Structure formats: structure tokens, C-alpha cells
Amino acid sequence: MKEYQVYLERARSRQQDFLYPLIFREYIYGLAYSQNFNRSIFVENLGYDNKYSLLIVKRLITRMYQQNHLIISANDSNKNPFLGYNKNFYSQIISEGFAIVVEIPFFLELSSSLEEPEIIKSYKNVRSIHSIFPFLEDKLTHLNYVSDIRIPYPIHLEILVQILRYWVKDAPFFHLLRLFLYNFCNWNSFITTKKSISTFSKSNPRLFLFLYHFYVCEYESIFLFLRNKSSHLRLKSFSVFFERIFFYAKREHLVEVFAKDFSYTLTFFKDPLIHYVRYQGKCILASKNAPFLMNKWKHYFIHLWQGFFDVWSQPRTININQLSEHSFQLLGYFLNVRLNRSVVRSQMLQNTFLIEIVSKKLDIIVPIIPLIRSLAKAKFCNVLGHPISKPVWADSSDFDIIDRFLRICRNLSHYYNGSSKKKSLYQIKYILRLSCIKTLACKHKSTVRAFLKRSGSEELLEAFFTEEEEILSLIFPRDSSTLHRLNRNRIWYLDILFSNDLVNDE
């Protein structure tokens, strides 16, 4: 680890060509293993213990030294001289090494920014999941229009590498990265399909997440720049910004560029109440003003993806809807703004008036059907929601089986405590409860009724329904009216760091 830190200090003074040698260092792979991102990447399936093998890494580095100068042609692509005989196994190890190495420049930039307070302002747009909750509670009810946008995947993963090259100037490293990706990911096709991207993301999660998140951050940095300068922009002058070579020069000398090139297209366009929220691959664009301005921003998104990232997206895929008539999905919730109408009688002197008051209320609904679909995918129930046993857990002890089911139930209750109607979670708890009982009965080779009668486990399984109330009673006074009121209100817990694993907003 000391050698790693010394190399980082040397890399601070060298602005380029410092990543390539790291891929041949053994301690890089040891660092990847110590982070325990993928427990099985350093283990050959030969019956040995699941431990980090320095011999495997030495063998891999030797092969890379011998073969990294080769350029694989179309005739030799099937032989795969770069990865050797055990392609999938070595590819996973190299992928982890690439993921560690490529994060180093950004770690250096972040650590240097922490030493200089004025640079921290560049990271002010970085927010956690907790910043979304106040937006939902405080801002959403005051907005009228919303656009639910799915950020498209790039048409080819080569685009991700090219975006990264603008920030990291290390040509040998990127040549080696391309050589690895072309061999392992089959990038010979002109268009990378969504299925191949999904396969790559599952087999190399860390490297893919880094490349994809960097792509999203790059798109957001340009979007936020355009958002801040929107008073100077017009649609027909917007595409000029996608010349990558001049983009940062234009951003630094915005006034001079506008005065020289865009003086004939300057118009006033400002929407001070437009809000942008993103989580994972979905973003929400909301505004209080007329849909005309929202339509402007929709075309900005289309031109941004097509002209800068070579991502084809059609305008009809982005819909602009009224919040009062449309619900959208975010963070595993269904959200809509409901209009509550009430009539108030007002009297002035001898005249009486009926005044209609319209108030907005935010409804945050638990998506029961997607949750049941996720439970069915995880083999807790069938597609109709009927509970089934979990035979793969039957080898564990009774306590471990019950604890696993309780942990899932606890996480779901904890995460969805911000919903308006928490009683809808009882159906999910019921499925998990019966699935737990059927799993225990399957383990003991008995029926559900006979197992419950013999073991008396029914009282223990009541924890599926009582645990959340016990947690609240530890925080708040043990008053039935207080707990009943808290059960109706939304509570956002601060220990929620990511969306629930059973929630998939694809």
C-alpha cells in the first residue's frame, strides 16, 4: 500500500502516461481484491479455497507482458492471444484492475480539491439520495408539468472510452483498454446492442458502472452549463456547442464567443422554476410554467444526445405531462399530485359567497405490481403473487432462514416508510411470511399446517408485521395514538443510501 501511495504522489507531477504501468503492478489487483467488490474473481474453479492467489496474478501479468504488443486482426480474433486459454477468468481480473486504475486520476483531483476550498464549488452539484426527498416533499406540489426521461445508453461503448480520453491523457493505457474490450466484449459490431451492454455490466460491474457514470456526469455537466446560460441560448444556435474541441474554450470565454458568433441569434429565454432530478438512469424535469418551455428543454436534450454523444433519441419518447393528471415512477415509488377541492362559505355584510379552494397533495404510492414481479423473479412467489418455497435456502438453519426473510421484509418496510399508504405493504409481507413458512416446511419435509402445529413457529413469524412498530416505539413515546399517526405519515429514514434491490425501474 505504501508503494501505491508513493506512485500516486509521483503521478501528481506527471500529467500523462502514468496509468499504463499500474496495470502491470501486483498490488493493484490486491487492492481490488481487498475491496471485496467481487468475491470470486481471483479464484479459479478448480476446487481450491476461495482465496486471493498471487500466483494467478503473476501468471496473468506475465502473459500481458508477452502479448500486449500484439494487434489482433480479424483472422486472429478467435485465437485470442491476449487473454490466453482461460478467457473469462482472466478477463474478470483485468477488468477489476482497469476499474481501480482508471479511478486514480479522479481520486487525485478530488483529494486536491479538498485541500483548496475554492475548488470544492465545482462539486456542489453532487448530491446524495437524501436531497431527492426534500424535493418531493417541498417542491413537487408547487409544480405543474413533469417530463419523465430515461437517459439512453450510448450506441457503442467506444463512446464511453472516447469521453474518458478527454480527461485522462494516457494513450498506452487506452490502447490496452480497447484491446481488452474488443476481445472480451466483442466490439467488432458497428452497434452495441442493449443485450451485450447488459452482459458486460453484469460480468464487469465495476468497470461498466465507472464508464457509465462518467458518461452521465459528462452529459449533466453540459446540461447544467446550458441551464445556467439559458438566457443566452436559442434552439438554432444550440448545436454549435457540440463541437467538442471548442466547447471548453467557449465556456471559458462565453461573452466573447457570443459577441462574435451568436450576436444575431441572442434572445431572452429563462425559466427560473425548472427543476432537474436524477437517480440512476432516470431523470425528472419539472417546471411550473407553460409546457412551451418544457418543450424547448426536450429538444435541447434530443440535440445534446444526438450531436454530442451520438445517441439516437426521438422526441416522441419524451412526454410532457401535467402532474395532476399523470403519475410517474422514481426511486421505486409511484408519484402523483392530487387536487383536493373544498368549498368555503364566506360572508361579507349581507352577501354570502361560495369560494372553491384547490389544494395540492402529494401521493407517494408503493408499486405493488412491480414489487410482486420482482419477488417472482427472486423465486419468492409466482407471477400471480402466490407464495412458493425457496428450496435453495433449505440447507440453512431455521434461524438463518427466518432471519433472511425478516431482513428482506425489514428493508422493504424501512425503505417504503415514505409512502402515503403503508398498509399496501401488508400484501408483500404476507407473501414473504408464507414463503418463509413453506421454505421451513420444505426443509423439514412436512406440510405447512403440520409444521406450524408441531413447531409452534407462528408466534415467531408474527415479527413480519410487528417489527416496524417496535422500531418506532424505540424512537417515539409508546402512545398508541402517536404510533397510529406516525403510521399514516411519511417518514424518510436517513440511513437509506440506495434504492431497494427488489426495485427495478427499467
From Swiss-Prot:
Q: Which gene is the coding source of this polypeptide chain? A: matK
Name listed for the protein in its UniProt record: Maturase K
Principal location: plastid
Instruction: State the Pfam families in the record.
Output: Intron_maturas2 (PF01348), MatK_N (PF01824)
A Gene Ontology BP annotation from the UniProt entry? RNA splicing
Biological role stated in the UniProt entry: Usually encoded in the trnK tRNA gene intron. Probably assists in splicing its own and other chloroplast group II introns.
For this record, an example GO cellular component is:
chloroplast
Subcellular location, in the record's words?
Plastid, Chloroplast
